[in-house]
């Protein structure tokens, strides 16, 4: 006559999916309990039921209170880096081309690769400053937990920053004016926000949208950020997200170098 007890553990790092999973789990428990309760009832007796036959204990991991900011704020770090690194790099190079200063730099003994690295280093420093400021604001205002290694977080941020700096350089080789560079940057940025899992869970997207999302570095960086900050996951368990992100970084670097050398030649 004692209730059957069961425990359900839910990954609550995404509060939207976790809330849906908790609701569905409770619904299953009630659906299993009702036939048993009806079978116990007798016409000549009436009593109050204090405990369901299926006693379900649900526990949410990583974000038990389902705080939405714990999920949103880490993603904002990636969104901020995506927008700024890609846009400021592409527009800065195009601006120098419009002014004619880029051609003056190319007449010096500096190699095109050295020029590209020189352009990327200051913006990479800006990117690390943005990560630091976002972390400080997230901790002080939104009480975001940091359960993993900050060193690993900054290391993965380096690859992500270089990835979008390279994409910004590639955009600068495909455009002639600052307006064109800004428009192309926004053309890439908006689908990235929608398909990376920042606004909507990727599991609920159509298959073509999920495939397109895999072509965007932000998709992988989102998982890395939330894995390190919310779950305390080590790098060894994040390789399925890290390797594609690094692969896209090298792809964008190679394409930007090829295009840049063609233009300088």
Where do the language-model regions lie?
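Hydrophobic transmembrane alpha-helices
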Residues: 76-83, 124, 157-162, 184-196, ...
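Short helix-capping/hinge motifs at transmembrane helix termini and TM-loop junctions
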Residues: 90, 94-95, 108, 141-146, ...
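Hydrophobic alpha-helical transmembrane segments of multi-pass membrane transport proteins
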Residues: 59-140, 163
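Transport-system extracytoplasmic interface segments
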Residues: 1-84
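Transmembrane alpha-helix boundary and packing residues in multipass membrane permease domains
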Residues: 87-91, 135, 139, 169, ...
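Membrane-interfacial helix-loop-helix junctions in multi-pass membrane proteins
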Residues: 62-66, 145, 197-251, 261
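Short cytosolic juxtamembrane segments of multi-pass membrane proteins
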Residues: 258-265
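Alpha-helical transmembrane segments and their short interhelical loops
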Residues: 112-185, 190, 235-242, 246, ...
């Amino acid at each position: 006559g004692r209730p059957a007890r069961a425990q359900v553990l839910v990954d609550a790092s995404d509060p939207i999916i976790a809330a849906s999973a908790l609701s569905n789990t409770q619904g299953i428990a009630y659906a299993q309990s009702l036939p048993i309760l009806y079978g116990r009832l007798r016409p000549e007796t009436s009593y109050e039921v204090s405990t369901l036959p299926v006693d379900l204990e649900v526990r949410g991991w990583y974000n038990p209170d389902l705080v939405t900011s714990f999920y949103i704020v880490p993603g904002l770090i990636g969104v901020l880096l995506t927008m700024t690194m890609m846009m400021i790099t592409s527009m800065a190079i195009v601006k120098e081309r419009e002014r004619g200063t880029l051609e003056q730099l190319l007449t010096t003994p500096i190699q095109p690769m050295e020029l590209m690295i020189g352009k990327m280093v200051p913006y990479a420093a800006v990117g690390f400053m943005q990560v630091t400021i976002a972390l400080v604001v997230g901790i002080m205002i939104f009480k975001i937990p940091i359960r993993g290694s900050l060193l690993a977080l900054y290391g993965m941020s380096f690859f992500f920053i270089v990835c979008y700096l390279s994409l910004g350089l590639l955009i600068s080789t495909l455009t002639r004016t600052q307006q064109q560079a800004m428009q192309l940057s926004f053309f890439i940025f908006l689908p990235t926000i929608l398909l990376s899992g920042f606004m909507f869970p990727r599991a609920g997207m159509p298959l073509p949208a999920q495939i397109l999302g895999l072509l965007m570095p932000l998709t992988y960086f989102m998982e890395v950020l939330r894995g390190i900050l919310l779950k305390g996951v080590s790098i060894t368990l994040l390789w399925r997200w890290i390797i594609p992100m690094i692969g896209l970084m090298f792809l964008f670097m190679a394409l930007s170098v090829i295009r840049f050398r063609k233009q300088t030649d």
